[in-house]
Curated annotation (Swiss-Prot):
Keywords: Ribonucleoprotein, Ribosomal protein. One of its GO terms (molecular function) is structural constituent of ribosome. Residues 10-22 have a biased composition (Basic residues). GO terms for cellular component: cytosolic large ribosomal subunit. It holds the Pfam family Ribosomal_L35p. It comes from the Bacteria. Signal peptide: none annotated. This is Large ribosomal subunit protein bL35. Residues 1-22 are annotated as: Disordered. One of its GO terms (biological process) is translation. Belongs to the bacterial ribosomal protein bL35 family.
Amino acid sequence: MPKMKSNKGASKRFKKTAGGIKFKHATKRHILTKRTTKNKRQLRPNSLLAKCEVAAVLRMLPYA
């Protein structure tokens, strides 16, 4: 049986850890002058994926 392919977009965005699946928030690259300080601060930490979305991401990453 051939190897399963990982979804390349998902493999670049998500990382499996012992506590769950880690991801980085979007809209933090450029043109940040429009955003408030509070908004930028809230987007700062890496977050864990919600439980309802974990199964879908793990299907995209068969070897995670």
